[in-house]
Amino acid sequence: MSGHSLGGAMALLAAFQLSDKYRIKEIYTFGQPRVGNDAWVSAFAARMANVTFFRVVSYMDPVPHLPPSWLMGYRHVGPEVWYDTTTQGSPAFCAAGQDSCSGQYSLFRCLFHTCDHCSYLGLNPCKANDPQPACVQGLGQR
């Protein structure tokens, strides 16, 4: 299963629900927001222990910082694959909750990098016909 942005969150929820009746092999999400609280994260980890799962984040994409964990207690599940640029390169791998990948940047700072949400692995998942998003650096999308 795979998804970008809210589609990534929906892929996680669907995989969790479907895993009762179907075998889920792999889950890859891109720019996914936080999905659940600590109890849900624990339940997901227990149920999906044998599923390959990676949460990919592009540089300072603000969406993975939402909703703010301090506001509602939401957390990420699974390891993070973090690209420190918006193009293909060598990613860093971080365990869930580790702040050395995208977590090193605050939500406020990431809000000035909204273009990073529509630039994954050199592709634009926000608009399939555009190779890269049209942005003004530091101001987000035009």
Give the predicted meaning of each segment:
Residues 3-7, 11:
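Gly/Ala-rich beta-loop-alpha elbow adjacent to hydrolase catalytic centers
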Residues 1-2, 16-142:
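Serine hydrolase/lipase
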